[in-house]
Structures are given as structure tokens and as C-alpha cells.
Swiss-Prot record:
The lineage of its organism: Bacteria, Pseudomonadati, Chlorobiota, Chlorobiia, Chlorobiales. The keyword Ribonucleoprotein applies. This is Small ribosomal subunit protein bS20. It comes from Chlorobium phaeobacteroides (strain DSM 266 / SMG 266 / 2430). Signal peptide: none annotated. Belongs to the bacterial ribosomal protein bS20 family. GO terms for cellular component: cytosol; small ribosomal subunit. GO terms for molecular function: small ribosomal subunit rRNA binding; structural constituent of ribosome. InterPro entries: Ribosomal_bS20 (IPR002583), Ribosomal_bS20_sf (IPR036510). Transmembrane segments: none annotated.
Length: 91
């Protein structure tokens, strides 16, 4: 338990931030899994591209706001792009 008032405040703030960070990362995880599921089930090309756009948009936002390291966001975007290109090439 914190002994000082400032330490109590830091604890409260870090707990709030932790919840917020987890929620944002969970949203991203859901988007990525959704795109993978669409590709695995051979969904319509337009639906997959829409899922790709929303995932890339979320990655950009998280990278800029530093919820993810910008390099990790960039790497994930490259992986998604490669996945999408392979899917489009197969169809």
C-alpha cells in the first residue's frame, strides 16, 4: 500500500491507464483475429479489404498515440498487407 498521497494518486492513475491500454489492445486483437477468420473462411474480397482497412486504421492510431511502439504497429501493418496480398492473389 502506498504511504504517501502522491503514491496513492500514481497508483490510481496507473490502474486507470492499465484498464484503458488493455481495452485498446483487446480491440486490436479482435480486429486482427476477425481478418484472419475472414481469410480462412474465404470470405468476399470486399469484406476482407474492409476488415484490413479498419485494422490498419486502428494500428495507425495506436502507434501514433504510443499504445503500441510505432515500429510494432508498422510491422503488424506490413504483415497484414502481405496476408491481404496473398489472399487477393489466390482469388
Amino acid at each position: 500500500m502506498p504511504l504517501h498521497k502522491s503514491a496513492e494518486k500514481r497508483l490510481r492513475q496507473s490502474e486507470k491507464r492499465n484498464v484503458r491500454n488493455r481495452a485498446r489492445k483487446k480491440e486490436l486483437k479482435v480486429l486482427l483475429k476477425n481478418m484472419q477468420k475472414l481469410i480462412d473462411t474465404s470470405a468476399d474480397k470486399n469484406v476482407v479489404e474492409e476488415a484490413y482497412r479498419s485494422a490498419v486504421q486502428k494500428l495507425d492510431r495506436l502507434g501514433v498515440k504510443r499504445y503500441l511502439h510505432p515500429n510494432k504497429a508498422s510491422r503488424k501493418k506490413a504483415q497484414l498487407t502481405k496476408m491481404l496480398n496473398n489472399y487477393v492473389k489466390v482469388d
